[in-house]
A protein has these predicted regions:
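A short helix-loop-beta-strand connector motif used in the catalytic cores of GNAT acetyltransferases and
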Residues: 66-75
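Conserved GNAT acetyl-CoA-binding A-motif
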Residues: 124-138
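Conserved acetyl-CoA-binding loop-helix of GNAT-fold acetyltransferases
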Residues: 103, 109-122
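Conserved active-site alpha-helix within GNAT-family acetyltransferase domains
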Residues: 134-157
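Short amphipathic alpha-helix that is part of the acyltransferase structural core
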Residues: 19-61, 173-174, 186-202
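Conserved beta-strand in the GNAT
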Residues: 75, 81-90, 95-102
Length: 202
């Protein structure tokens, strides 16, 4: 927590289980209610341009995800009310899975992504699990370094393969990262089972 005051018209608890406050103006976080929410539609440009097609859930499959009580789709608005970042998480007792996290290109390098990640990390210490591309080129290595600077560690001990989001797709390898501690075998198995049963369900 930063100790800053919240505007009177904003709840301190965002419905996803963590308290929200930004250290600088003017980002405002909102939880998206579903695929018919205008904020969802406004976030699709960031979603589509930030992730390769094989890593994207089809738009028609999002309604099923929204039915899960632990699914949180959140967007961040600038002072003009424009969506400039998105964060998609799944909350479970053992872990919080960060599925999608992207910042509009206009804000990259200005610390917005860092602040958003720090708020999530601090709200769920030692529970956040995320995935990155294997660090095989400059971009992926910089992404690895970004998360390492914020307390996340890679888990190369697991040969993690992400299932396809569509019947026509192919599985693809990713590197799991966790906050603070390496994944133990039990948590890893629980995560993989959850991921197959819920995240890529269609």
């Amino acid at each position: 927590m930063t100790g800053e005051d919240f505007p009177e018209d904003l709840p301190k608890e965002d419905g996803c289980g963590w308290i929200w406050s930004m250290k600088s103006e003017p980002l405002i976080k909102r939880r998206v209610a579903g695929v018919d929410d205008p904020l969802f539609l406004d976030s699709l440009d960031i979603y589509r341009t930030s992730f390769p097609v094989h890593e994207q859930r089809r738009i028609q499959d999002f309604p099923l995800a929204f039915q899960d009580p632990g699914f949180c789709y959140e967007v961040f608005l600038n002072g003009e009310g424009r969506v400039v970042a998105m964060l998609v998480t799944w909350r479970r007792e053992q872990f919080v899975y960060l599925e999608y996290f992207a910042v509009d290109a206009s804000l990259r390098g200005q610390g917005a992504g860092q602040r958003i990640l720090e708020e999530l990390r601090d709200a769920f210490p030692h529970k956040v699990i995320l995935e990155i591309d294997p660090p095989e080129d400059g971009i992926s290595r910089r992404r690895l370094g970004f998360y390492q600077r914020h307390g996340f560690v890679p888990n190369p001990q697991f040969d993690y393969i992400h299932p396809p989001y569509t019947d026509e797709g192919e599985p693809f390898p990713l590197l799991l990262m966790t906050h603070g501690d390496l994944l133990d075998e039990e948590t890893y198995r629980s995560f993989v089972d959850f991921h197959h049963r819920h995240v890529v369900a269609r």
